[in-house]
């Protein structure tokens, strides 16, 4: 689609302007109908753009998804495929960074008696993840809607499926203006 191509071109420009073209060059190829079947499963990708919707509110639910050697780490298993990388001279540094990140996440996971210390340890792991470019945050989606439902009356859960419950919604058959929702 044209939207997908436009988005890819914008991202290529952002990468070029931010990181330069020496080490990161976005090569835009043809559109595919199934990223999983045509790109991720045959391991033809260099990176991916996707999101994660947490099942529960602990940082482990997010940060555990890119840990090394963990079969339940979705991103590691399905997207980065880091668990399949064979250690060579060329890959040793990358694998060591993933192992260090995993050790930081495991250390945070082990803290169960002090929530502040647990979150501080997860913050350290997250900072390592981003600083070492194991994951690079690149976009955030905000959905705009024309609605007859007051969004302030809806459940606003940060994770799980609670946001889908139609309970105690306030509605207006004429819709809402920006002023009414301010």
Question: Could you say what each language-model-derived stretch is?
Answer:
Residues 17-77, 121:
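Periplasmic binding protein-like
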Residues 37-43, 64-106, 140-182:
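Short, solvent-exposed loop/beta-turn-alpha elements that line the ligand-binding surface or hinge
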Residues 8-11, 28-29, 63, 120-124, ...:
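Composition- and surface-driven signal marking solvent-exposed, interaction-prone regions
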Residues 13-20, 130:
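A general structural signal for alpha-helical elements within enzymatic catalytic domains
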């Amino acid at each position: 689609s044209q939207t997908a191509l436009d988005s890819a071109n914008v991202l290529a420009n952002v990468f070029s302007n931010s990181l330069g073209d020496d080490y990161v060059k976005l090569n835009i190829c043809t559109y595919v109908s199934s990223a999983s079947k045509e790109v991720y499963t045959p391991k033809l990708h260099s990176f991916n753009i996707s999101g994660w919707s947490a099942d529960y509110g602990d940082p482990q639910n997010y940060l555990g998804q890119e840990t090394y050697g963990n079969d339940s780490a979705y991103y590691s298993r399905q997207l980065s495929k880091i668990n399949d990388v064979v250690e060579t001279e060329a890959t040793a540094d990358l694998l060591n960074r993933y192992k260090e990140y995993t050790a930081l996440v495991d250390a945070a996971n082990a803290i169960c008696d002090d929530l502040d210390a647990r979150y501080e340890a997860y913050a350290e792991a997250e900072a390592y993840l981003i600083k070492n470019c194991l994951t690079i945050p690149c976009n955030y989606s905000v959905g705009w809607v024309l609605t007859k439902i007051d969004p302030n009356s809806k459940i606003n859960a940060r994770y799980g499926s609670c946001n889908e419950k139609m309970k105690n919604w306030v509605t207006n058959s004429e819709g809402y203006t920006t002023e009414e929702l301010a």
